[in-house]
Amino acid sequence: MKKYCVFLFAAMCSFMGLFAQSSIDLSGTWQFQIDRNDVGESEKWFDRTLDDTMPLPGSMPEMLKGDDVTARTEWTGSLYDSTYYYSPAMEKYRVEGNIKFPFFLTPDKHYVGPAWYRREVTLPKDWTGQRIVLFLERPHWESTVWVNGKKVGMQNSLCVAHEFDVTKYVKKGKNTIAIRIDNRVKDINPGPDSHSITDQTQGNWNGIVGKLELRKTQHVYIDDLQVYPHLADFTAVVKTVVVNNSGKAVKGAIDYVAKCQSVARGTHSVNETKYHTFATGTHTVIDTLLISERAILWDEFHPDVYRLQTQVCETYMGSLVKMDKNITSFGMREFTIDGKYFCINGRRTLLRGTVENCDFPLTGYAPMDEASWERVFRICKSYGLNHMRFHSYCPPEAAFAAADKVGFYLQPEGPSWPNHGSSLGNGEPIDDYLWAEAERMAKAYGNHPSFCMMAIGNEPRGHWVEWVSKFVDYWKATDTRRVYTGASVGGGWQWQPNSQYHVKAGARGLDWDKRQPNSMDDFRGNSFMAQAGPNEPYVSHETGQWCVFPDFNEIRKYTGVNKAKNFEIFRDILAENDMAELGHDFMMASGKLQALCYKNEIEKTLRTPDYAGFELLALNDYSGQGSALVGVTDVFFNEKEYINPDEWHHFCCETVPLARLPRFVYTTGDTLNAKIEIAHFGEAPIERANIIVYLCTEYDEKMMVGYFIKDIPVGSCFEVGEVSVPIEEVNRPEKGHLEVLISGTNFVNEWPLWFYPQVDDKELALTPAQSEGKAAKGSKATNTETPAFPYITNTLDEKALDILDKGGDVLITAAGKVTYGKEVQQQFLPVFWNTSWFKMRPPHTTGIFVNDAHPLFKEFPTDYSSNVQWWELLNHAQVMQFTDFPKGFQPLVQSIDTWFISRKIGMLFEARVGNGRLMMTTMDIDSDLSHRIVARQMRKAILDYMMSPYFRPQFEVPASTVQDLFTKVAPSMNMFTKGSPDELKPKIN
């Protein structure tokens, strides 16, 4: 009996020892050497000491390894603007020691090719005879491994960890591991602009990040475990792949412990043991766990996750002895489709998403820790978002875990934008590679409840529709835990008939370049949306892309791998054009317009029936493709000054009050009519909601104009009612707003309004007699009927020169007349994406910066930025270029040029010319003033100011310089390349 007890104790200690140390951390200093000539394998570098060292985890750029960046550096990514390489103005940035690129962030070091990493590791004695795996969480991107001089194999996933079974290669005691990482694009070409590899965002780096470990298991182990929740019967089907390489059948069991700890809903746990016999080889074991009706469900409002511990056990002398353990997370949730909408646990939801582009300048790669991703998702949630699409890449495990915790619906993608030199469906190696990557993604991340949607990549070319159709069909039949689309595409791409849902452009944007702003229209009747079947949700692809001027204060934040030397160039250009001090003002003014556009595009989507959601491009800035500053946060997800999350939340959250207004400008005798709606996608209907409508003015007057009590269902376009407000006597120009709120909640929204008085034609100097000009001192002018008005003309004619010479006042209304500035095409809407990537496609401006403290604007209420009342004056209006004006000169209404050129341009200025005073504008303040309320008021404001004692222009400008505005022509912009992005090509895939 004593011998038996000793034997049993020894056996149990042996089993316990298997779990004492199950992994060895390989982080630390590794030997390192660049293999520039690709000779390392033939020269057996895996078997010798390397000549440098580098810490892992880490990347070569992060550790300042590689080549200095020069003008000859070959980047991974498309360029459609070659001015940097040919323009004399860019020559100083091509000089070694001062290398700066305008197209994307600039790393200190760059290297593409193989590099070697080597180290020794000592195995514990109790690892002898066990299965041992080398785990590399995120190499970039092809890894080849040697152990003790013997080649183990190669892996090249861009999405999941590389795991090498090194059992046959290790020995007792010291072992040598050599890893060759190669980041070249070879036979497998994801596309140079794929965010998995491109220098446009993260950079095509060489290295290994995340966890680096040797992991030990027994020879009976869990190779895969997938959990499939079913809400109909509150069960979870667990598919466990058990591998038995022990050489004999093993009788035992699988022990399951699932536990959810919810702060709001308590704790729920399930413990079940299922008995099995594990024959030699690989087997899939399917067990069903009864979670019960006490199951705690997961969604964006209650992101409660179950932690499942699964242990494979062997029956030993009547007891279960643990052999291998797997810990995973899953959510009791179902993400499905109901008609045109997505459903979470049977309740409709609307995706309010952003596109994440692997843009992390400090490291140059996606964060590998959960805390960093949790910060990103919580910031996005503070802006009312609930969804993220990962553009042509798949994030690491930490991102899914953080999204599970925060409650975010994710669409990771295969690591490919198979275009611009690559293709899909043409029989190239990328076809099989992406198919395998999807399998790997589902295996690695499939249990995460946040993994709700999947696509293979972005905007392919080739015979891709047939390929993605097979892809979607396969996954629909294979794994119903999420929904599938083939690829996320622009409006010009072919339709994907087999996709369960569609991420496609076409039904997006604002048409304010063609008609005046309103909040009436929506995307009903859109031809793109009409293509989708009755059970196929439609999500807008890359919504927004409205630009904002760079924030040069941001430059100091780039303390890591990638530096904002593009911003330094843009700052220099602004300074060279005599506007160094205006950078922050331009950022703020253009940002206000950007936020206005995002608000109205999002609301337009919310006003559209059967619209499943939108994906912004993006909440944060995009640092590449010419520097696409499209975010209301910087690239680091820090808020910009012109709008904060609370303000954004008014028009972008689960419950948004909406008002359909045909216009935003009113005058005496008009009637303000508004249809009130609610888009509500909260966790439950709102019963007996008190909905209040206020009309507010800038003078703190607040009048209730509507009150409704309604039960608000979950869904879009819920009609609340209408309000109608007669606009009585308007005595002065005034700004106001319409406010709609749901009492007792934080759901409130507002729309800007402008009220202008009726203006008598006599005050506008519309007749020839009135516009002849007042008598200047010493002149022979005798017109005494209208002595107050300046001389009004549309050019600097001889009479204007004579009046100015004699000390008189002149107003030039030069709409459509100037040539110097004609090269700049202005619209009310700002630059889309950026002018470099789209080869100077108009518009070229990002709004206006107004000297709103100037006395002229006493009669024309305005902020320092453009708002919807400016549309009538600004849209398609010519600008004047002030390059030749005196240093320090600034117009009263300054158009904000594309930051690649930053010409000093504008639409309204004053100056002393000769002995007189000149006011000149290219805004149309002449035509159809009986219908153009804003233009009429602007004309009156200008005239009133010119006739006031405050008309004292600061700068003196030669008459010849003013005359040049009508004769001089600026040189055309040469991009020095014939290539163009897909959207500018006549035929799109």
Predicted regions and their residues:
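Catalytic beta-strand/loop cores that center a nucleophilic Ser/Cys/Thr
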Residues: 819, 836-933, 950-989
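Extended acidic/polar, glycine-enriched regions
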Residues: 170-174, 241-336, 729-761
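Beta-strand-rich binding/interaction modules
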Residues: 145-147, 235-277, 285-287, 670-711, ...
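Accessory carbohydrate-binding/adhesion or oligomerization-edge regions at the termini
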Residues: 20-98, 180, 184-186, 942, ...
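Substrate-binding/catalytic cleft of secreted carbohydrate-active enzymes
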Residues: 377-378, 387-633
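Short alpha-beta junction capping motif
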Residues: 787-834, 915, 921, 942, ...
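N-terminal carbohydrate-binding accessory modules
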Residues: 309-380
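Accessory beta-strand-rich segments of carbohydrate-active enzymes
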Residues: 33-37, 66-67, 77, 83-97, ...
